[in-house]
């Protein structure tokens, strides 16, 4: 009976070790595929339009800020008939970024205090 128990433990150990190695191989393959996809995406990415620059030709080309993508906002200037479009950050997103930044700084202070 002891022999069967010892053999069973050895079998389970070998099985778990081999499955762990297989999972590591799969994870490495997934990482390699993901990196190649990211490189392809970066290669085909076009230049973004900075904040407050004209985005009338491509309204989806605005750059990202720290957390959110800027939005192409169009308006008619006072006394003008031509529509003007610029990349801008909506105020509510601006306030959310400020709050997130302050929370991050406060979290760093708490971490520093309590080590």
Curated annotation (Swiss-Prot):
Stated family: Belongs to the neurotoxin 19 (CSTX) family. 01 subfamily.
Keywords, in A-Z order: Disulfide bond, Knottin, Secreted, Signal, Toxin
InterPro entries (alphabetical): Spider_toxin_CSTX_knottin (IPR019553), Spider_toxin_CSTX_Knottin_CS (IPR011142)
Domain of life where this protein originates: Eukaryota
Locations listed in the record: Secreted
Entry comment, domain topic: The presence of a 'disulfide through disulfide knot' structurally defines this protein as a knottin.
Protein name per the record: U3-lycotoxin-Ls1b
Residues making up the propeptide: 21-44
Expression by tissue: Expressed by the venom gland.
UniProt source species: Lycosa singoriensis
Classification of source organism: Eukaryota, Metazoa, Ecdysozoa, Arthropoda, Chelicerata
PROSITE patterns in the cross-refs: SPIDER_CSTX
GO CC terms: extracellular region
Paired cysteines (S-S): 48-63, 55-72, 62-87, 74-85
Any one Pfam family match given in the protein's UniProt record, by short name: Toxin_35
Signal peptide extent: 1-20
Gene Ontology MF terms in the entry: toxin activity
